[in-house]
């Protein structure tokens, strides 16, 4: 399906130069002189290579339609994730590299959404937030104000995040999986 380049969004799958690409980032740039253009960072689905491409906002690109399917993560088998279809209980292998930076947030029995193009997996979406435990947190530096100061902390999955000074080791917090940022203390 053809669409204007300025409608490209992260997560979409497009066809360009005879290859399939998944869009990682996009930014519309409006220079002081001349027309606006869109800068797109994308990854080749077959080779995994990344590239940047620029289009004028009026250009058209071929967007591939994706099917979204719900699966449950079972376990990791080498370089693949084993997912289970909740309706048919069939197991489905997906390359682990599709997760990218979100891989540490994958937990047993987590519900995930897999994007498929003609039956081939092209992307995995985790829930927007996960609850994890703080295993290590720096002490609060005396004299810091609570309004804008954050301190580093290490989560149970090994990811480091910046948390408010009142958070201590042993507490459970909610973390945004997209960018590894602190959201709030876990309730309950």
UniProtKB/Swiss-Prot annotation:
SUPFAM superfamilies named in the record: Nucleic acid-binding proteins (SSF50249), Translation proteins SH3-like domain (SSF50104)
Recorded GO MF terms: translation elongation factor activity
User: Gene encoding this chain?
Assistant: efp
Pathway listed for it is: Protein biosynthesis; polypeptide chain elongation
Q: Biological process (GO) annotations?
A: peptide biosynthetic process
Family designation = Belongs to the elongation factor P family.
Question: Could you tell me what this protein is called?
Answer: Elongation factor P
**One short Pfam family name for this protein?**
EFP
Broad class of where this protein is predominantly found: cytoplasm
UniProt cross-references to InterPro entries, sorted A to Z: Elong-fact-P_C, NA-bd_OB-fold, Rib_uL2_dom2, Transl_elong_fac_P/YeiP, Transl_elong_KOW-like, Transl_elong_P/YeiP_cen, Transl_elong_P/YeiP_CS, Transl_elongation_fac_P
Q: What does this protein do?
A: Involved in peptide bond synthesis. Stimulates efficient translation and peptide-bond synthesis on native or reconstituted 70S ribosomes in vitro. Probably functions indirectly by altering the affinity of the ribosome for aminoacyl-tRNA, thus increasing their reactivity as acceptors for peptidyl transferase.
Q: Which organism is it from?
A: Acidiphilium cryptum (strain JF-5)
Q: List the disulfide bonds.
A: none
């Amino acid at each position: 399906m053809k669409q204007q380049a300025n409608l490209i969004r992260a997560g979409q799958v497009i066809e360009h130069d005879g290859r399939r690409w998944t869009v990682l980032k996009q930014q519309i740039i409006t220079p002081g002189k001349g027309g606006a253009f869109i800068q797109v960072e994308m990854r080749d689905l077959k080779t995994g290579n990344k590239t940047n491409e620029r289009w004028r906002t009026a250009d058209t690109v071929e967007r591939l339609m994706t099917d979204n399917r719900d699966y449950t993560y079972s376990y990791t088998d080498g370089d693949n994730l084993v997912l289970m279809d909740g309706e048919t209980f069939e197991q489905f292998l997906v390359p682990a590299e599709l997760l990218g930076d979100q891989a540490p947030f994958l937990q047993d029995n987590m519900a995930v959404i897999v994007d498929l193009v003609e039956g081939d997996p092209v992307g995995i979406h985790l829930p927007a937030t996960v609850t994890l435990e703080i295993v290590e947190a720096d002490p609060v530096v005396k004299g810091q104000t609570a309004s804008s100061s954050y301190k580093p902390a290490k989560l149970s999955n090994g990811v480091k995040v910046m948390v408010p000074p009142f958070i201590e080791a042993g507490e459970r917090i909610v973390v945004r999986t997209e960018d590894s940022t602190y959201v709030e203390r876990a309730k309950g």
